[in-house]
């Protein structure tokens, strides 16, 4: 089964790279599902920053495209970002990682640490070893040089092999 479980839509908000501000994504939900279907991807998770709105909107198109949609969010905590999958409502940003994970699990969701060693994105780093996470992203397409992904892969495979989670499919 092909899945891409870390996708942002136009609802994801404004990102910052140093002093530059830019839309995190400009993708329409319809276009995301059209591309997913074309590539043979069967499941997508919409994980906009601090909102489930994009996931909710994309879920409405699920049957039209025959691609399963998981509603999620990439939530900013006091220490870094955590992805919640299978969410029913927004989780407030700015909570501790522990509180965020608790709120994800209260909804029956999964808590995933995205890009744990990113020098650019807000990352949890070695805190991933102390938290009750369901998975850790070991490949993130934003880090195309491979260095950050290799650090995550090597550390997670060594310490948490059952939680290594490649949540991005790349052909």
Swiss-Prot record:
<dbReference type="InterPro" id="IPR004013">
    <property type="entry name" value="PHP_dom"/>
</dbReference>
<protein>
    <recommendedName>
        <fullName>Uncharacterized protein MJ1587</fullName>
    </recommendedName>
</protein>
<dbReference type="InterPro" id="IPR052018">
    <property type="entry name" value="PHP_domain"/>
</dbReference>
<comment type="similarity">
    <text>To M.jannaschii MJ0417.</text>
</comment>
<dbReference type="GO" id="GO:0035312">
    <property type="term" value="F:5'-3' DNA exonuclease activity"/>
</dbReference>
<dbReference type="GO" id="GO:0004534">
    <property type="term" value="F:5'-3' RNA exonuclease activity"/>
</dbReference>
<dbReference type="Pfam" id="PF02811">
    <property type="entry name" value="PHP"/>
</dbReference>
<dbReference type="InterPro" id="IPR016195">
    <property type="entry name" value="Pol/histidinol_Pase-like"/>
</dbReference>
<dbReference type="InterPro" id="IPR003141">
    <property type="entry name" value="Pol/His_phosphatase_N"/>
</dbReference>
